């Protein structure tokens, strides 16, 4: 009879450790979602408010650089805004994972949606990165000149918004891995 009780005690301790680890993963997932939200919304706002005007010869002739002059940068803003909206809405499910233990279906749903948002965000960030590269370096073969020597503030802001977006890409990858780890621990 004693050996049966010892097995039950050992099993219940294992369940408690597993539950504690699942709760820690859920809390970390919640925090990462908040950090990723601030990165994506910050990137969208920074890029969306980027514009610089330079006078040319006289005050009546000016050159302007705005994010919406290039479709890739507009796509970047939209992608970051969509992902930040998703991250805010997913916080409710992430909170449920902290409170409840049996959350397999919602974890699978979040993994699928996280992968979709990762694809959208990485597409937006990659397309904007190509434009930022051209703005900094130009392309001699096609006679596209680097504009960052003239539009320094514009280039600093769009480069900064890219950094925040790529940090959010890494955070989404970590969220997917954490959800997969949490699912695998249940089986």
From Swiss-Prot:
| Any one Pfam family match given in the protein's UniProt record, by short name | CASP_dom
The UniProt entry lists membrane topology as: Multi-pass membrane protein
Keywords assigned: Cell membrane, Cell wall biogenesis/degradation, Glycoprotein, Membrane, Transmembrane, Transmembrane helix
Give the record's GO biological process terms.
cell wall organization
Q: Which residues lie on this side of the membrane: Extracellular?
A: 46-74, 129-161
Topological domain (Cytoplasmic) residues are 1-24, 96-107, 183-187
InterPro entries (alphabetical): CASP/CASPL, CASP_dom, CASPL
What is this protein for, i.e. what is its function?
Regulates membrane-cell wall junctions and localized cell wall deposition. Required for establishment of the Casparian strip membrane domain (CSD) and the subsequent formation of Casparian strips, a cell wall modification of the root endodermis that determines an apoplastic barrier between the intraorganismal apoplasm and the extraorganismal apoplasm and prevents lateral diffusion.
- Listed NCBIfam families: A_tha_TIGR01569
Family the entry assigns: Belongs to the Casparian strip membrane proteins (CASP) family.
PANTHER family linked to this entry: CASP-LIKE PROTEIN, CASP-LIKE PROTEIN 1U1
Q: Identify this protein by name.
A: Casparian strip membrane protein 5
């Amino acid at each position: 009879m004693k050996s049966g009780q010892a097995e039950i005690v050992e099993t219940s301790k294992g369940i408690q450790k597993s539950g504690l680890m699942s709760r820690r993963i859920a809390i970390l997932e919640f925090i990462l979602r908040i950090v990723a939200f601030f990165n994506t919304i910050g990137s969208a706002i920074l890029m969306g408010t980027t514009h610089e005007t330079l006078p040319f010869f006289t005050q009546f002739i000016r050159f302007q650089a705005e994010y919406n002059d290039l479709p890739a940068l507009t796509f970047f803003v939209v992608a970051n805004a969509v992902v930040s909206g998703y991250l805010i809405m997913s916080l409710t499910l992430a909170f449920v994972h902290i409170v409840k233990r049996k959350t397999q279906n919602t974890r699978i749903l979040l993994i699928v949606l996280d992968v979709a948002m990762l694809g959208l965000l990485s597409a937006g960030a990659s397309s904007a990165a190509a434009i930022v590269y051209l703005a900094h370096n130009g392309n001699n073969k096609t006679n596209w000149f680097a504009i960052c020597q003239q539009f320094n503030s514009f280039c600093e802001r769009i480069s900064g918004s890219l950094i925040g977006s790529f940090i959010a890409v890494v955070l989404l990858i970590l969220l997917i891995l954490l959800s997969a780890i949490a699912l695998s621990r249940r089986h």
